[in-house]
Amino acid sequence: MAQPERKHALPRGTVLRDSYRIESILGAGGFALTYLGSHTGLDQKVAIKEYMPDQFAVREADRATVRPRADAGDDYKHGLRRFAEEARTLAKFRHPGIVPVTDIFEENGTAYMVMEYVEGESLHQHLGRVGTLDEPGFRAIFDPILAALAEVHANGILHRDIKPANIYVRADGSPVLLDFGNSREALGTKAQSLTVAL
């Protein structure tokens, strides 16, 4: 599979918070970049998501600092707050069907979310490889995902973007739900015009 390219991505070897080294880019969306990283002290792979909204920000010449575009400062700040809120919300969950968030921090004028690196493939890729699922195969993936969603819903959060690309099948066959960027608290908040895609 070809590696995603993104002209605003942090260079390989960049060290964040004196602990996390950028190894490569895993994915790029309109609001965030996801990197394969390593925790330099623990010698562990991690996934690092960086808030980097193309329409609201640019990367400075130092190839690290993120600066809001002149006409988008308020939108950038709003999205940054949402990104941090989503990370803090996800960090509360301890469920095998939800990827653990282990750290969040601000640096370079933006925010970063550190998560367990999940080895495997998206359900979309999995279905392309194995074809149609029989009932036991379907239940092996969706029973744990439904249990994860029940946990999320019990805490007043709606995922709002369930699709094969956002369900990852680990190397051991267990599924995990990714990308809570379109999630929203079900009660007690008004609709926001900006949704941060984590």
Cite the ranges covered by each PLM segment.
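Activation-segment/catalytic-loop signature of the eukaryotic protein kinase fold
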Residues: 104
